[in-house]
A protein has these predicted regions:
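Short acidic amphipathic segments
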Residues: 2, 12-15, 30-57
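Short, surface-exposed ligand-recognition loops at beta-strand->loop->(often short) alpha-helix junctions
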Residues: 16-26
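Charge-rich, low-aromatic oligomerization/scaffolding segments with amphipathic character
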Residues: 58-68
Length: 68
């Protein structure tokens, strides 16, 4: 998946998915996928902006690897 990290601080990352507009089904799949990860504290998906905000506890590289 192609993406751009828009903003990050320790424990939170905001990512924009590089596509047109995200469907509700795609947003649900992404939210379920990242909520199932052990490092995930909370996940918000904004389908109109094609953005994901992930609050995590753990290694940043693991989150970025799962985004790819």
């Amino acid at each position: 998946m192609k993406f751009v990290i828009k903003h990050e601080i320790r424990g939170r990352i905001r990512v924009q998915i590089l596509q047109g507009r995200m469907s509700i089904e795609q947003a649900d799949i992404l939210q379920y996928y990242f909520n199932a990860k052990p490092y995930s504290i909370s996940v918000k998906v904004r389908e109109r902006l094609s953005e994901i905000v992930i609050h995590y506890d753990g290694d940043r590289e693991t989150v970025v690897r799962d985004l790819q």
